[in-house]
């Protein structure tokens, strides 16, 4: 399976290749997967004090806002709202009116680039996103499934891997939240989330919009970083291989079935125990 790879905010292709390097080496070694990287088209400058954190310039984003995110990204780490559910936390952090204005063009421009990448390489059938790149990747999955239901479009993305991340953006340029959307996303997905990630609720809200029977939760036992060493890396590679193996040859017909909302994750969830979640309702 060939994956389209999307870096995080203030990232670039060289930096993301390094971040994913150990996983890619293991998966390419035995031919399990191949990878195509694209770079965001929105040129940005890291927030003051974060220049070294994001590495050498240039820096890019996939989601274009109206200038507020540079401040909010830093402030969000310090004051991420406490709430009973990830969805409530996201609504408090990103009020709907602010999102509709601040991200008015973000979704359309990101989708334009991602569909161009799919058109340019017919072998791509999977997607990987890190942090903001996970939101952009999820936005593509969300749009493909909306188009499938409305116009019979056959989705290209058959599997998705999200490192941390945020929910997809809807046509209204607001986060797709599981307690607001009509349909969950029925695509095999792997969600890597760290218990110490300051943006954990964003990743949990992203996980919650995917069908429980097709989503796998992977505890990275860390923060907002990608596993790159030791046993955790081996387990990640194994999880990716399992994801690829579980993708049906043609799942377009299955996607037409209505989603059934199952167990969702709340903000107080004990992440180390989440690996057992998928088996509770089996």
Swiss-Prot record:
GO terms, biological process: secondary metabolic process
Superkingdom, taxonomy of origin: Eukaryota
Record note on biotechnological use: Liamocins have high bioactivity against the pathogenic bacteria Streptococcus spp. and can be potential new specific inhibitors of oral streptococcal biofilms without affecting normal oral microflora. Liamocins are also able to inhibit human cancer cell lines such as breast cancer cell lines T47D and SK-BR3 or the cervical cancer cell line HeLa.
InterPro entries to which the protein is assigned, alphabetical: AB_hydrolase_fold, FSH-like_dom, LovG
Enzyme Commission code: 3.1.2.-
Active-site residue numbers: 131
Keyword Hydrolase among UniProt keywords: yes
Induction: Expression is induced by the cluster-specific transcription factor GAL1. Expression is also regulated by the cAMP-PKA and HOG1 signaling pathways via the transcriptional activator MSN2. Moreover, expression is also increased at low pH by the pH signaling transcription factor PACC.
Matching Pfam families: FSH1
Signal peptide: none
Keyword entries, A-Z: Hydrolase
Enzyme class, UniProt record, top EC level: hydrolase
Gene Ontology cellular component terms for the protein in this record: cytoplasm; nucleus
GO molecular function, a single term: hydrolase activity
Family: Belongs to the LovG family.
Role played: Esterase; part of the gene cluster that mediates the biosynthesis of liamocins, glycolipids (also called heavy oils) composed of a single mannitol or arabitol headgroup linked to either three, four or even six 3,5-dihydroxydecanoic ester tail-groups. Within the pathway, EST1 catalyzes ester bond formation between 3,5-dihydroxydecanoic acid (provided by the HR-PKS PKS1) and mannitol (provided by the mannitol-1-phosphate 5-dehydrogenase and the NADP-dependent mannitol dehydrogenase) or arabinol (provided by the L-arabinitol 4-dehydrogenase).
Record protein name field: Esterase 1
Species this protein is from: Aureobasidium melanogenum (Aureobasidium pullulans var. melanogenum)
């Amino acid at each position: 399976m060939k994956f389209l790879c999307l870096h995080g905010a203030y990232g670039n292709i060289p930096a993301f290749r390094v971040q994913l390097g150990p996983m890619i080496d293991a998966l390419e070694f035995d031919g399990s997967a191949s990878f195509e990287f694209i770079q965001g088209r929105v040129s940005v400058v890291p927030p003051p004090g974060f220049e070294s954190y994001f590495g050498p310039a240039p820096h890019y984003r996939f989601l274009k806002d109206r200038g507020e995110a540079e401040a909010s990204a830093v402030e969000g780490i310090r004051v991420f709202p406490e709430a009973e559910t990830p969805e409530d936390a996201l609504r408090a952090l990103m009020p709907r009116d602010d999102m509709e204005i601040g991200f008015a063009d973000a979704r359309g421009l990101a989708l334009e680039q991602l569909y161009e990448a799919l058109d340019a390489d017919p072998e791509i059938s999977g997607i990987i996103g890190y942090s903001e790149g996970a939101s952009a990747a999820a936005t593509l999955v969300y749009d493909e499934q909306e188009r499938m239901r409305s116009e019979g479009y056959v989705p290209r993305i058959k599997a998705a891997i999200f490192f941390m991340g945020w929910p997809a953006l809807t046509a209204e340029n607001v986060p797709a939240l599981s307690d607001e959307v009509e349909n969950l996303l029925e695509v095999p997905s792997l969600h890597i989330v760290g218990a110490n990630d300051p943006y954990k609720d964003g990743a949990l809200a992203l996980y919650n919009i995917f069908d429980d029977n097709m989503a796998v939760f992977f505890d990275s036992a860390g923060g907002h970083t990608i596993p790159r060493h030791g046993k955790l890396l081996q387990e990640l590679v194994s999880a990716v291989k399992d994801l690829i193996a579980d993708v049906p040859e043609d799942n377009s017909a299955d996607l037409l079935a209505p989603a059934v909302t199952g167990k969702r994750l709340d903000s107080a969830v004990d992440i180390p125990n989440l690996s057992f979640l998928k088996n509770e309702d089996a």
